[in-house]
Every structure is written in structure tokens, then in C-alpha cells.
Amino acid sequence: MKPLVVFVLGGPGAGKGTQCARIVEKYGYTHLSAGELLRDERKNPDSQYGELIEKYIKEGKIVPVEITISLLKREMDQTMAANAQKNKFLIDGFPRNQDNLQGWNKTMDGKADVSFVLFFDCNNEICIDRCLERGKSSGRSDDNRESLEKRIQTYLESTKPIIDLYEEMGKVKKIDASKSVDEVFGDVMKIFDKEG
């Protein structure tokens, strides 16, 4: 059985992680956060990629696509090997740019099906405020204003065109992410109840 994938996209602080956790609980998806996989890998002393990832993340740059895809693929393979029924995945924070998308199409073509793109649309100021709030407790080194403005810039330049591309294919489900967590999840449920 091939993995069924929903790409979850939106700017930093749009609430992707929070909503993914709820989708997992209610709909039995497995949540893979590209950023989290990279952060874990970077901390793993045995990783062949650790230092390289560290360098990219520190500079606010996007990690080379081969690394990200190999981590995503490894996780999907391991999850499905452990339980063949678990073939539905939410991939959060990927593809972030054209290069990511091409890499995915090249590597995963015929190996995984993308059902749709869940796009959390959120005003930049709201996103920044949420991240600064989160930074107080998350300990994430990139939750500071300077890093955030860079991340939002990168997102607008690189990720937004990907969303537009999927939009043309009729594959984007757009959600107003500036609402409260519960309201946003209400909108998410409408989509997943229909799409499964």
C-alpha cells in the first residue's frame, strides 16, 4: 500500500503543529514535521547530517532537499513497516520551495500519493506574535523577531508559489488560521470529514 500524504503548509506561527496534533488524534494520521525531523537529526550525535543541518538552520536557510526527503521517507517506511494500516501521513512544513517540490516529485513519484494541501492562511503580524509568545517557553532558537522576519520572508518568496501551483491543480484546502484554535479545528474537521 502506498502512503497517502497531506501536505500541511502555512507561515511560521500559523498553528500547523497544534492542528496536526488534533488531526492525528481524531483521524489516525501520522504527523511528520519536516522541521522536527531535521531538529532531531541535528541533535543526534551519530547522524551523518547533523552538522550540516545545524549550519543551515542557524542561517535561516532551507536544508538541502535530499536530506529532508530521505528523513521523511525513512519515517514513512518505518511507520508502515510497523503497522501496514498506518498509511496516512500529514507532512508539515514541506515542500517549502520549488526545489523541495521537484525533489519530492523525482524521489517519491509513484511511491506516495498527495491527497491535498492543507493551507493555514494567517496574517504575518499574528504569526509573529504567536511565535514570540511560543519562544518564551519553546526554547526554539529561531523564535525571535529577527529570525521570524527572515522566516516569513523566505516563506513568502518560496512557499507561497508552491501553494499557488497546487491551487491551479485544485488541490488546496484553505483555512483561515487567524481564528482561535477551536474554530480553526472546526474548519479542519469539515475538510477531513469529507476527504477522509
UniProtKB/Swiss-Prot annotation:
GO terms classed as biological process: 'de novo' pyrimidine nucleobase biosynthetic process; CDP biosynthetic process; dCDP biosynthetic process; dUDP biosynthetic process; ovulation cycle process; phthalate metabolic process; UDP biosynthetic process
Residues modified as N6-succinyllysine: 106
Residue(s) carrying Phosphoserine: 33, 180
Binding site for a ribonucleoside 5'-phosphate: 39, 61-63, 93-96, 140, 151
Cofactor(s) essential for the protein: Mg(2+)
Top-level taxon in the UniProt lineage: Eukaryota
Keywords recorded for this protein, A-Z: Acetylation, ATP-binding, Cytoplasm, Isopeptide bond, Kinase, Nucleotide-binding, Nucleus, Phosphoprotein, Pyrimidine biosynthesis, Transferase, Ubl conjugation
Placement of covalent cross-link Glycyl lysine isopeptide (Lys-Gly) (interchain with G-Cter in SUMO2): 73
Entry-linked Gene3D superfamilies: P-loop containing nucleotide triphosphate hydrolases (3.40.50.300)
Residues annotated with N6-acetyllysine modification: 43, 55
Residues the entry annotates as binding CMP: 100
Region (LID) location: 133-143
Location relative to the cell: Nucleus; Cytoplasm
Note on how the cofactor is bound: Binds 1 Mg(2+) ion per monomer.
Binding site for ATP: 13-18, 134, 179
GO-annotated molecular function: (d)CMP kinase activity; ATP binding; CMP kinase activity; dCMP kinase activity; nucleoside diphosphate kinase activity; nucleoside monophosphate kinase activity; UMP kinase activity; UMP/dUMP kinase activity
EC assignment: 2.7.4.14, 2.7.4.6
Reaction(s) the record says it catalyses: CMP + ATP = CDP + ADP; dCMP + ATP = dCDP + ADP; UMP + ATP = UDP + ADP; a 2'-deoxyribonucleoside 5'-diphosphate + ATP = a 2'-deoxyribonucleoside 5'-triphosphate + ADP
Domain notes: Consists of three domains, a large central CORE domain and two small peripheral domains, NMPbind and LID, which undergo movements during catalysis. The LID domain closes over the site of phosphoryl transfer upon ATP binding. Assembling and dissambling the active center during each catalytic cycle provides an effective means to prevent ATP hydrolysis.
Family indicated by similarity: Belongs to the adenylate kinase family. UMP-CMP kinase subfamily.
Protein role: Catalyzes the phosphorylation of pyrimidine nucleoside monophosphates at the expense of ATP. Plays an important role in de novo pyrimidine nucleotide biosynthesis. Has preference for UMP and CMP as phosphate acceptors. Also displays broad nucleoside diphosphate kinase activity.
Record's subunit section: Monomer.
Name by which UniProt lists this protein: UMP-CMP kinase
Taxonomic source organism: Rattus norvegicus (Rat)
Organism phylogeny: Eukaryota, Metazoa, Chordata, Craniata, Vertebrata
